Amino acid sequence: MFRPSIKFKQSTLSIIARRLKSSAQHQPLRSSFVPSPIVFVAGLAVAAVGGYYCLDSRSAIHEYVLCPLIRTFTDAESGHKLGIFFMKYGLSPRLLDDGKNDQSDVLGVQVFGHKLKNPIGLAAGLDKDGEAIESLFNCGFSYVEIGSITPEPQPGNPQPRFFRLPKDDAVINRYGFNSSGHFNVLATLKLRFNKLLNKFGTSHSSEQHPFSNAFQQGKLLGINLGKNKFGDEVNDYVKGVERLGPYADVLVINVSSPNTPGLRDLQSEAKLTNLLTTVVKERNVLGKNLLGNKPPVLVKVAPDLTEPEIESIANSAKEAKVDGIIISNTTIQRPVDRLLTTDKQLINQAGGLSGKPLKPLSLKALRTLRKYTKDSDLVLIGCGGISNGKDALEFGKAGATFIELYTAFAYKGPGLVGKIRDELAEELRKEGKTWEQIIGSDDK
């Protein structure tokens, strides 16, 4: 058998090596990639479009990807804190057409001496310490309410104290007025106020200056006041008016959280009249806030009230000369006939229920309250279970001058505000009316 010699093998290998070297000198290296200018520009364009898409709060990625991911990988309270963290540092999306296509021709509403762009507000409880005000306004809210804020810092109830009912788009919370206290929030508000005042400047004309603590045209900042667990049932609120009133467009007296022992007892007529009368007197002593406006006083009440109790609240509000009533807070009821959640241990957690199952209760309470206040100047604010434009319209027709969201916003993400705004405007245009024209129209 023929066996090639070692010399032959070496000769053959050297020839192959020379040919490969020659080929390499004339062929481009295919393993190296140098992007052409077109590819580079296209990449930048894709990144820019993607970034713009994610910055728009109404992008589907927020409702259908990011919010579900947060719910999957965090418990309810951790998810809450994460959301506030992102908003605090400006890492959250915004409603990009809030300035141009704001639907204010249909949705604008005159309230407390201001013209709101739309009747959509944020309820207290989300931003407890006023850390994310700008980002929340940038979502499209015309009214943002921070708090509840107590005089002294307190941790609230032990954890776990916040529970999701995802099948019902609902939550149960028993936070218990966890708050960093008046002075810590005051420091945050002062820093924000001075920063924005310097940025805005003092030389603007009245037409240009918003003259509200929102520092945005057609928007207002509300501050919700609570009492410490073992605090005085009157003086705790008076301190809040005195300390935080200068930075508020609206002051809210919260007597309806179910998670502070004895708090709801303040809704009885004698106690409530005394409390609200004292608070209004303190507001009058305070006079105007730092931007020259006297902040109106509202009281926030529960949905778990009988008709006589609602009537007595209306009487107290009129006698004390407060400016309005927010109805309602969370409910201690568990309407099992409307709940899809079947886990009894979860359903029976102590605390207040909010979200979609609350809507029938809060809407009924609003209609009842309207019955006893329509002969007055009291402004009613609807809150509880609102998650779309049709819900908002129902509350408006029942007597709400504007409405507030919280739980639906947490579930659906920042795009919900723009979605409700556009849905509500569409419903009103179908009827050929504006928001102001339909307020309380159910009782005509």
Swiss-Prot record:
Note describing how the cofactor binds: Binds 1 FMN per subunit.
Sequence positions that bind substrate: K128, N173, R174, Y175, G176, F177, N254, V255, S256, S257, P258, N259, N329, T330
Transmembrane segments annotated in the record for this chain: 33-53
GO biological process per UniProt: 'de novo' pyrimidine nucleobase biosynthetic process; 'de novo' UMP biosynthetic process; pyrimidine ribonucleotide biosynthetic process
Inhibition and activation profile: Inhibited by the dianisidine derivative redoxal and by brequinar.
A single cellular component GO annotation: mitochondrial inner membrane
NCBIfam families in the cross-refs: PRK05286.2-5 (NF003652), pyrD_sub2 (TIGR01036)
Name of the protein in question: Dihydroorotate dehydrogenase (quinone), mitochondrial
Origin species: Candida albicans (strain SC5314 / ATCC MYA-2876)
Origin organism lineage: Eukaryota, Fungi, Dikarya, Ascomycota, Saccharomycotina
UniProt gene name: URA9
